Design a protein with these regions (language model features):
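Glycine-enriched alpha-helix->loop->beta-strand junction motifs that scaffold or abut catalytic
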Residues: 2, 29, 36, 59-69, ...
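Generic enzyme active-site microenvironment
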Residues: 6, 10, 42, 71, ...
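Active-site gating/metal-coordination segments in enzymes
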Residues: 1-40, 88-100
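Mid-to-C-terminal alpha-helical segments outside catalytic/metal-binding sites
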Residues: 33, 139-175
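Charged helix-capping and loop-helix junction motifs
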Residues: 20-31, 50, 102-110, 134-141
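Short acidic/histidine-rich active-site segments
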Residues: 115-137
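Conserved, mostly hydrophobic/aromatic
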Residues: 8, 34, 73, 85, ...
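Distinct, well-ordered alpha-helical segments
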Residues: 45-63, 71-74, 78-86, 104-109
Length: 175
């Protein structure tokens, strides 16, 4: 076994269990750790996109993150957030929330190039339709893949091959 990434780490302003001032130094430490060991960082972002992006750009400009790369886990941002994440050398991972009727994510998914897109379950949360509101499980990732296939106009097989190749690349996993 080997470590393939650092995280999930990030900023979460939704729960208010820890202040911004408490969270940000720890987040900086984790992203520096990922870069020190040349590992991708998996970023959790809940109501903190502005601070996460600014912090990453600031660290990168200070020369602390020469080999910064990672995954924007369970992405829920807008088109600007997609552009910023891609500029920072991140992959963008989507979960079951892309299947929700009122989700804005189907409009941003086309902005993500095929070589930077991933899917995930975020189990036990964010179950895709028709399981919304129930406990999520790994088997439901197929529903997320089907929705992604529909949006990207790929076959389900193409989606599987693309997202698997991307996961292998970002996590440096050989066949």
């Amino acid at each position: 076994p080997k470590c393939v990434a650092v995280g999930e780490t990030g900023l979460d302003y939704y729960w208010k269990e820890a202040t911004r001032e408490q969270q940000q130094p720890l987040f900086r430490a984790f992203i520096r750790l990922a870069c020190m060991y040349n590992k991708p960082v998996i970023i959790h972002n809940r109501e903190a996109n502005h601070d996460i992006i600014n912090l990453l750009y600031e660290e990168k400009q200070n020369g602390n993150l020469r080999n910064l790369r990672g995954i924007m886990h369970c992405f829920s941002g807008d088109s600007e957030a997609v552009k910023q994440a891609l500029d920072l050398n991140f992959y963008i991972s989507f979960s079951g929330n892309i299947t929700y009727k009122k989700s804005h994510l189907p409009s941003v998914i086309p902005l993500v190039p095929h070589d930077r897109i991933l899917i995930e379950t975020d189990a036990p949360f964010l179950s895709p339709v028709p399981h919304r509101g129930k406990r999520n499980e790994s088997a439901f990732v197929r529903l997320t893949a089907q929705k992604l296939s529909e949006i990207k106009e790929w076959t389900l097989e193409e989606t599987g091959k693309i997202t698997t190749a991307n996961a292998r690349r970002i996590f440096d996993i050989s066949n």
